[in-house]
């Protein structure tokens, strides 16, 4: 979708929002998910009193109804009512939303930041503002924004704090905006805030073909003479080379520690560790003096569509620990990063987003989209990511599946 077309859509949505507002106040759209499934309730919802809402189609959303496999995320609907955001909030129509490993872990009951079930997942998305609440002066109906939220983005219409929205550059598509925040904030803060990436450094990027991995590769290219080791299956190596990986490593057939030691006997300066378990220890022992391992995930917990108790036990048993004295003697650092626990650090996150948008406008970064799936195909989208078939970001879009 071109930026011009999206701008036209934004104007249309803004006009629609004003028209709805003139019909009178109504109940605000609930932020918690509905409980009526499309497939199981063919009867239309009761018509609201407002005439504009009476003819509006129901709003679609995805809801996690229980912990387990792909079928636990259901497509549901709720009646459309005039948006009524509270003070400091905005309501937007969602055009695209991101799929992240946290969503996969949440489905299995392994993500501690997930609100109680049933809940609409989704930490990020992009769309058009349709209404603003009291006290909001920096957003207006028609603004194209991207959103970073604790959950709830996998739905057609959502109300969020205005402070958690960011204006999109004119040239940015909704798909790019939905692919930017979680992956690029994570990669940026791991590499620069924790890693202090500088010219001449070397970096190990695990899962280099994933969303965070591809973001990290682009960010590494903004610094001169950075050597990048990237792990991924062999079929993805050519793409990794095209995107700045100096030494791709097939983790299926090769011990990445041995491969790195052959090329760089002293190791690397930064290890980006989304794996956890024994891989954190391996990363620590790969560090040069003054090196840093930054752990930001537990992907080793995910070995299938459902929770694997053996994998959980193995990962936790192999969890890495180190004493302060050992760190002192080794001249190394171990850091932890969890974007979900920075949801109250508005200024900190906004600073990073400002840097990222500047890099986007300068042409230094551009989210790579692996695939875009309609809400009906959410199970296929999750499978694509969990089986590590993706190169770049996997996205969801609210619109119904188009007939071919």
Swiss-Prot record:
It is a peripheral membrane protein. The modification N-acetylserine is found at residue 2. Keywords: Acetylation, Cytoplasm, Membrane, Mitochondrion, Mitochondrion outer membrane, Oxidoreductase, Phosphoprotein. The modification Phosphoserine is found at residues 2, 31, 40. Changing residue 213 to A: Fails to induce mitochondrial fragmentation. Fail to induce mitochondrial fragmentation. InterPro entries: ADH-like_N, GroES-like_sf, NAD(P)-bd_dom_sf, PKS_ER, Quin_OxRdtase/zeta-crystal_CS, SV-ATPase_mito-regulator. Changing residue 211 to A: Fails to induce mitochondrial fragmentation. Residues 9-24 have a biased composition (Low complexity). The lineage of its organism: Eukaryota, Metazoa, Chordata, Craniata, Vertebrata. It comes from Rattus norvegicus. SMART domains: PKS_ER (SM00829). GO terms for biological process: negative regulation of mitochondrial fusion. Plays a part in calcium-regulated keratinocyte activation in epidermal repair mechanisms. Has no effect on cell proliferation. Possesses ATPase activity. May negatively regulate mitochondrial fusion. This is Synaptic vesicle membrane protein VAT-1 homolog. The keyword Cytoplasm applies. It holds the Pfam family ADH_N. Transmembrane segments: none annotated. Ubiquitously expressed. It comes from the Eukaryota. PANTHER family: SYNAPTIC VESICLE MEMBRANE PROTEIN VAT-1 HOMOLOG, SYNAPTIC VESICLE MEMBRANE PROTEIN VAT-1 HOMOLOG-LIKE. It is an enzyme of class 1 (oxidoreductase). The gene is Vat1.
């Amino acid at each position: 979708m071109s930026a011009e077309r999206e701008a036209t859509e934004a104007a249309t949505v803004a006009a629609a929002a004003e028209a709805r507002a003139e019909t009178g106040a109504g109940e605000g759209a609930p932020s918690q998910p509905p409980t009526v499934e499309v497939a199981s309730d063919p009867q239309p919802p009761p018509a609201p009193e407002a005439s504009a809402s009476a003819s509006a189609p129901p709003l679609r959303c995805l809801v996690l109804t229980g912990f387990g496999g792909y079928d636990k995320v259901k497509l549901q609907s709720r009646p459309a009512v005039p948006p009524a955001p509270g003070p400091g909030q905005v309501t937007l129509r969602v055009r695209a939303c991101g799929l992240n490993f946290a969503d996969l872990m949440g489905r299995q009951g392994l993500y501690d930041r997930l609100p109680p079930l049933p809940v609409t997942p989704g930490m990020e998305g992009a769309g058009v503002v349709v209404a603003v609440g009291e006290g909001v002066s920096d957003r207006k109906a028609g603004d194209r924004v991207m959103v970073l939220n604790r959950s709830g983005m996998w739905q057609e219409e959502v109300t969020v704090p205005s402070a958690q929205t960011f204006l999109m550059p004119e040239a940015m598509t909704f798909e790019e905006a939905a692919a930017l925040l979680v992956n690029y904030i994570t990669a940026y803060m791991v590499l620069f805030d924790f890693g202090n990436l500088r010219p001449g450094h070397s970096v190990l990027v695990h899962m280099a073909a994933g969303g965070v991995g591809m973001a990290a590769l682009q960010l590494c290219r903004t610094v001169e003479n950075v050597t990048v080791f990237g792990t991924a299956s062999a079929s993805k190596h050519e793409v990794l080379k095209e995107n700045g990986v100096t030494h791709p490593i097939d983790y299926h057939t090769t011990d990445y520690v041995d491969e790195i030691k052959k090329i760089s006997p002293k190791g690397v300066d930064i290890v980006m560790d989304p794996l956890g378990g024994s891989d954190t220890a391996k990363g620590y022992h790969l560090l040069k003096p003054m090196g840093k391992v930054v752990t930001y995930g537990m992907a080793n917990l995910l070995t299938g569509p459902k929770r694997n108790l053996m994998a959980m036990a193995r990962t936790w048993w192999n969890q890495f620990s180190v004493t302060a004295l050992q760190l002192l003697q080794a001249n190394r650092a171990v850091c932890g990063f969890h974007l979900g626990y920075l949801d109250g650090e508005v200024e900190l996150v906004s600073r990073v987003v400002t840097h990222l948008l500047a890099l986007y406008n300068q042409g230094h970064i551009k989210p790579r989209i692996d695939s875009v799936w309609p809400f009906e195909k959410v199970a296929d989208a999750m499978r694509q990511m969990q089986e590590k078939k993706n190169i770049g970001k996997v996205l969801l879009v609210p619109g119904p599946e188009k007939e071919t």
